[in-house]
Amino acid sequence: MNSTMEAKEIIKEIVGKTEVKHVVFVGCGASKADLYPAKYFLDQNAKQLRISHYTANEFNFATPTSVDENTVVISASLGGATPETVEANAIAKDKGATVISLTRIVDAPLTKDADYVIYHGFAENYAAKLEKTGYCLLLAVELLNQVEG
């Protein structure tokens, strides 16, 4: 788990260890919505990567068979304690996926099964409310650039 790395470094480290073929975005409510712009960006630009976007419970009860060691799961939970998203991280980890989580609370339950954690300042001020979406977009851009060139 690492919260000091930038998106570019995180993706570089992941791509150095595994051949990324599938990116899955997982969350509930507003956090799921905050992941959507990155999913849309990859849908429109990726030619090789498989892209999925699930509510956490959908992921938990109908986990795609394609989730494996070549999958990056990007999860988000504002406070890091949404039970369904915490469970989704555990399931993804059990399937061998690399998990990147976005939250604002250090050592939240969401971070337990995450390989990488990005903390955002959602509660600090109005402008910070876009940080979660922004960080997720940075991850998507880096995935596209480093996986597909």
Segments the model singles out, each with a brief description of its role:
Residues 19-149:
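Glycine-rich phosphate-binding loops that contact phosphosugars or nucleotide phosphates
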